């Protein structure tokens, strides 16, 4: 049997996930959601409450630094000077791009042990010649993979992926 027999997928508001579970889970995939919620700390607390001790959170969020860098490279100086206000109510641009240091602090304050950080699209979105994203994909992928877990490139990624562990109760300080 494959692992899919041991998997359960729940589609609901993050704040409501506890009401859909009977027992704590081993792994939570929470990708591209944190930047859409007004109260991320309470969402992280909810995720903590449904994860078993020793379980892992896979968290990916839209990076405010990546947004700033993208706009600077594009020459959108006035927009950056204005604080990069969201232009339209209904758009695919997230409502709350997250500062990585703030997210890391929320995780640590919540008791999570950060295991790893990875920048996602640390070079791809900044290429001046957009055709290179396609035409030079193999070389770009190799370089993305080489640098995506090193600073300052982590912090320049358009998204940041964090793996964090909920300690076993005996591990807690």
Question: Regions from the language model: what does each represent?
Answer:
Residues 16-22:
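Short conserved loop adjoining the S-adenosyl-L-methionine
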Residues 32-33:
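Short catalytic micro-motifs in class I SAM-dependent methyltransferases
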Residues 41-56:
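A short glycine-rich, Lys/Arg-flanked "PGG" loop and its adjoining helix->strand segment in the class I
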Residues 92-117:
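Short alpha-helix
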Residues 116-173:
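A C-terminal cap/extension of S-adenosyl-L-methionine-dependent methyltransferases
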């Amino acid at each position: 049997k494959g692992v899919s027999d041991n998997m359960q997928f729940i589609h609901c508001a993050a704040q409501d996930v506890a009401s859909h579970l009977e027992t704590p889970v081993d792994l939570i995939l929470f990708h591209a959601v944190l930047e859409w919620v007004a109260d991320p700390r309470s969402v992280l607390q909810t995720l903590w409450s449904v994860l078993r001790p020793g379980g892992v959170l896979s968290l990916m969020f839209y990076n405010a630094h990546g947004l700033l860098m993208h706009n600077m490279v594009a020459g959108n100086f006035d927009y950056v000077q204005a604080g990069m206000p969201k232009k339209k109510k209904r758009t695919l641009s997230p409502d709350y791009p997250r500062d990585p240091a703030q997210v890391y602090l929320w995780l640590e304050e919540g008791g999570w042990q950060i295991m790893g950080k990875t920048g996602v699209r640390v070079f791809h979105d900044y290429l001046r010649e957009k055709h290179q994203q396609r035409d030079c994909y193999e070389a770009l992928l190799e370089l993305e993979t080489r640098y995506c877990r090193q600073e300052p490139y982590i912090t320049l990624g358009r998204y940041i992926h964090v793996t964090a562990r909920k300690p076993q109760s005996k591990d807690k300080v």
